[in-house]
Structures are given as structure tokens and as C-alpha cells.
Amino acid sequence: MLNTDKWTCRHAALALAAFGVESVVTSPGSRNAPLLMAVSRHGGLMTLSVVDERSAAFIALGIAEISQRPVALVCTSGTALLNYAPAVCEAYHKHLPLIVISADRPEEWIDQADSQTMRQPDALSNFVKLSVDMKAEPADEEQKWLYTRRLNEALDCALAGCPGPVHINIRISEPLTAQAEYHNEQFHRISVVTPPEKVSTTTARALANDVRQKNILIVAGFGAPDAALNKAISSLGRLPNVVVLAESLSNLHSDDVLQVSDSLFSGISADKSAGFVPDLLISFGGAIVSASLKRFLRQADIAEHWHVGTERNLIDTYRHLSTAIQISAPAFFPRFAGALNFLNKNCAGISQFKKNWIDIANRRSVVLWHKLQAVPWNVATAIGHVIEAAPISGMNLQLSNGLAVRVASMSCLDKFHRVDCNRGVSGIDGSTSTAVGASLAYKGGDTLLITGDMSFQYDLGALASNYLTSKLRIVLLNNGGGGIFKYIKTTRSLPEVDSLFRCQLNVDAKAIANAFGLKYYHADSYESLQDAVPAFFAGPAPAILEIATDAGIDAAVLTETTTNN
């Protein structure tokens, strides 16, 4: 087959396929021409071309998150690589294996006033697991052996242990489009054998025996759906001395799991807080959205805290860490749940600790419902109506950061197959691109994105890609720009809140929808929302439903629903 004459570029493509990569998101360029030829001419790789590298990287992230497979990125030299940084950083903190491959100029031309040239090796070093630097044309067989090993090291590193992104930098000399015939080239993959993750029955029973009589609070952060984990956590939640708190992003669905939102903690008064403090806290998953939960746990007098996970750092979010159990949650909890259920099988009646949590959750749910019925048109009630009207058809939900993830968490999201948000570093950039990637990877139904106006405008490049599918629906929350800053305590009382924080926007969502070929719907009242929502979900896609609200009213409603009354 006719292919690039650059050995390392061809073998990088072979390595991707050997390690299970199926999707490669590329961006146009000249220096990366050999790489583009290599990946596009490999029959086992599907390429998607996206002009905007920042958007391309978030699309790749969305594909990786939903497919649970490594995804590669290919860019040209210069600042193109730096545009990957936000998504790569998010992937690092969400433990997603993005394989970044950047074309570079020859080493002798760095810092020599040559165009589109910068110091690329280690440019992403703060948020990749490994960086490697190679020439496109090895000098001899020994260097080919070296580069084969480096490609193995990089790809194995991306997938091993706690997964994450890696960076492969390839220095390419001219001519860039030279080609030759190559047949039956193979990549020598080095097999790395690791022992399976396993908790022995003896260890699980020893741990369970130590804590069987303690009040246990399990807190779940964000994570992918996992049937075995869900079953284990549900069984723990049924025990008389165990309370499970989970945010919607944890993707745990059970009547025995209490859903977390800031409104839950507004019902816990200072004089009663001791009754909610566990003897043992067990945490797992990614970052928590609820500031109230974090504040409560950090201030509580908790004697013992276990964190379960494969992160390389010690995760002490709540400042009480006593034990780091370095194994994945799906490997740990089924054994631990089995042991604790066996030891507590004859326990009768629930603890006062658990009664306290169940009571506050039930009371706050009723209070929240009544409050939202008694307020004028606002974003929280509107989103609640959209979520309630969403079809139960295996739909995935993507949330942007800021107001969207907080407001959506006030509703029950169990009808969705999974719920995701870029909470690795919680940026507002890339939400739409991530949803585009997620919709490409998810085969079970539609993808619904709920996004704020600032996040939406930040990532318009996603709509310009060629990969908007008929399975993508977008709910745009338009409160004039950055309405969350009128709600959060740090900014709402500042005189500059409107001029410097909200950055009030005049987003013409209808014109944007028309420009990019999306069906458009609009709601600015309960009546218009009731008319728009059925058509939005039943009509053609991709589509945008713009919900226009007043930022001041939204802030007042959110403040009211998270106060203790």
C-alpha cells in the first residue's frame, strides 16, 4: 500500500491500532501530513477531522468517556498543540486515555526564528502521564528498536493503572508528502502482564469486621456506570448503619442511595449536625460538585476516613484521610459489601444516624418541591420540567459547569442512562464539543446537553464541526450571561458583579442555530415551555431549546431553595 515514507509515523498508527484505539481526531496542517496519511490509510482506524484543535480535543474526550476506549489526537506543529491543553488537563483529572500525537520541526530549527516552531516536548507535562520525543526517520535499526519501545511505553502508560493522557512528539523533516509502497508492516507490541485487581475474602471480612458496628457514610463522586458497583453500593445502602450519599454524576441508581444537592445540607442546623457525623467515612470517585457537602465533612469530627481508588496521589478532599485503599471501586466494593452484609445479616432496626439522614432527605425533598411551585418563572423549575419531560429511552445527559450542573442536580436524574460533566477541572470550555463526541460514541440513544450561555458561546466551534448528529439535543440556559455569579456568595454582593463577572452576553441563539443547521425552539415562560418541550424531544435533531430567564430571579430562587426554612 502507498503510504508516508516516515517510519515513525507509520508505526505510530500501527501502535494505536495494536493498543485498541479505534478513533483518531485530527486537525489539518502541513507538518503533520505524514501522520495524517498514516492514520487515514490504516484500515483499523476511523479518522474525524476537526479544524479547531481545542474543540477537537474535547470531542475526543467525549468519545473516550462514553466508549471507555483510548482515543488519539493528531495535530500540526506550533500552538496547535497548546490548544489541546484544556481537554488534556480534563482527561488527566478524569483518568481518560487520550493519546496526543504532535508533529514537530526538526530539533535544529527550534528557537531559530523559523515559522510555526516552539519547544514542544514536555509542553503538556503537567497533565500527561508520560511524554516521549522521537524523530520521524530513525537513523538505524537500533533507533527503530528504541522508538518501538517508546511507543509501547507511552500507550501502555495511558492504559495501565489509573488511565490518563500521554504525549507523543514526532519531529518531521521535509519532504512531508513523500510516499512509498509498504506491505504487511507489523508493530511489535510488548505484552505487560499485571495481576488482576482483587480483594481476598479474608481481607474483605477483616475490614468489615473492624467497622461492622460503626456508623458509616459512603460518599460517591463522579464515575462511569458500573452494574456490579451499583449493586454493591445498593446493598451497602440497605444496611442499618450505612448511609450512601451520591451526586447524579456518580451514575449510581438506587432507592438506597441518597442524592446530594446543596439544598440537602441547608436543613442541617449547627446544633443538630453531630447526629449526621459518621464514625467512618468512605469516599470514592471523582470531584464533588456540592460545596455544602465538602464544607460539612471538612468541619465534622470524623475519626476515620478511607478513600478507595487507583489515583497516584493521596486524595484527602475532606481532611480526615486515615487509609488509602488503592484499588478500583468496582473491584473493592462487591467483596466489602458481601462481607459486611454477611456480618450484619441479623441486625434489626436502623441506627439513629441513618434515621437522621433519611429524615432530612425526605423533608428537604418536600420543602424543595413546595418552594419551586411558589416562585415565578426561573431556571430551576424550567430545567425540572425539561428533565421530567425527557423520554425514558436510554438517553445520556451531558451538563456544562456552572449553573447547569447545579440546577440539574436538584432533579432526579435516574431516568438517564448516564450523566456526565467535565468535573475533572470544572472548566466551562469544551462542554458542547464533549457532548458532540459523546453523541458520536453513544449507540444507545440520544445525548442531551444542558449548558449555560457563557459555556455555549465559548464553544461555538463545536457546532462548526462536521459531526453534529441526529442524536444531539441542546438545552441552552440564557440568563444574559454568567447568572451563577449573582448566586454564589463570593461574588453576588460585589458592585462589579454585572460589569466584570457576568460579562453579559447578547447571544442570538436562533441565528446561531440557523447558521449551523440546527432546529430551534424557544421558551421564556411556563406556557411557552410546555409548548416547546414536546416538539423539542419529538422533532428532528440536532436541535436547540433556548430557555430565557432573568438572572436576578434565578439567583433569588436558588438562594431560597438552599436556605434552612
Task: Cite the ranges covered by each PLM segment.
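Active-site diphosphate/adenylate-binding microenvironment
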Residues: 9-17, 27-31, 35-37, 358-444
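N-terminal cofactor/phosphate-binding cores enriched in small/glycine residues
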Residues: 4-89
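Thiamine diphosphate
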Residues: 101, 108-121, 407-565
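Phosphate/pyrophosphate-binding active-site segments
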Residues: 1-4, 134, 297-403, 510-511, ...
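Glycine/aspartate-rich loop-and-adjacent alpha/beta segment that forms the canonical ThDP
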Residues: 122, 163-165, 170-200, 532-565
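Glycine-rich, anion-gripping cofactor-binding loops and their flanking helix/strand elements
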Residues: 220-306, 314, 414-444, 457-461, ...
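A short, small-residue-rich loop immediately preceding and capping a beta-strand
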Residues: 22-26, 46-48, 66-105, 277-285, ...
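Glycine-rich, acidic loop regions that bind phosphate or pyrophosphate groups
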Residues: 102-154, 246-360, 466-467, 489
